[in-house]
Amino acid sequence: MISSVRYWFLVALVVIVYVAGMFVTLFENDSAQFAVMAMRMVQENDFINLFKGPQEYLDKPHMHYWLAAFSFKIFGIHDWAYRIPGILATLLGAYSCYGLGRLLYNKDIGKFSALIFMTAQTIVLSNIDVRTDAVLTGFSIFSIWQLVNYLEKGSLTSIILGAFGAGVAFSTKGQIALLVIGICILCHLAYTRKWKSLLSWKLIPAILVFSITIAPMLYAYYLQFDVHPEKVIRGRSNRSGIFFIFWEQSFERLSGQGHGKNSSDFFFFFHTFLWVFLPWTILALLAYWFRVKTFIKLRFQYKPQYEFVTLGGITILFFIISFAQFKLPHYMNILIPLYSILDASYMHSKYRYSKDNTIK
């Protein structure tokens, strides 16, 4: 489909773009503010309390700021040092796209999935304007890949790595990580009918690993908020950080409470997708349309050559997040790996079965 030399040349070009973007001045609002939050951790040697300016911060959990602070500790406080964890997480996400694409289809689709993911406009931007979504996206697709690998092969290592990835993603942005990972896994289980995998003893060590991974974040929230009911956060006292991250966070964004409403447009993410996935948008829309037609024609009967992780995950998650009253374009980033694999599988089928040399 694409020669190895050309493929690695294109990957190298993308990495060069990522590296060049490391030295750009940090953008306002989020990137610069998040970097300052991590810088405060290092300068005050306080890795428990989150502050945004003078205000205590109860929104996104600690992992992104810890990783940035760790980078500052090693390399010093620089714009480029802040971006290193996000870029590494993106490379992990690209490798996970390769792994999941190879697992669900074949090696060629896996390689092309990684390239599509790395070159999508919003992913390139997310490595320059680094927010929490770079780490969230990388570890979410890593978790999905490992958990699907467990369902297919019963690997203990895979389910433990999947649980670890889910824990890091949850500690980065909260419930949205578990929603995305959980729905993708449920879609795979529903399509393959491998429900017995949920009865395995291997879930016990996986749950333990997930709990250990999120424990530092929960402990930090407990110390900052739960033991200080007198603190007033967004006009309310008696705020529990643990209750917030397990329950309140996503509901506040869906309802617009706490953050305000910035868009009630149900189609916001559709017209946002038209530019965030450039230059692959049109092909992705065609891939989605033809895959829906295929599943309807098959009446959703299981066929080994197809998978429902990407199509099901995209459809359900797109529908859910469209109801949110607080929307921003980079909220789409976590779905880009799924679109990349779906897009790659569509183009591979066109290349393999089309008799039109122009398409090839």
Predicted regions and their residues:
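Short acidic/glycine- and proline-prone juxtamembrane loop motifs at membrane-interface regions
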Residues: T122-L136
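Transmembrane-helix motifs of polytopic, lipid-linked glycan transferases
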Residues: I84-L104, F142
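Transmembrane-lumen/periplasm boundary regions of multi-pass, lipid-linked membrane glycan transferases
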Residues: A177-L328
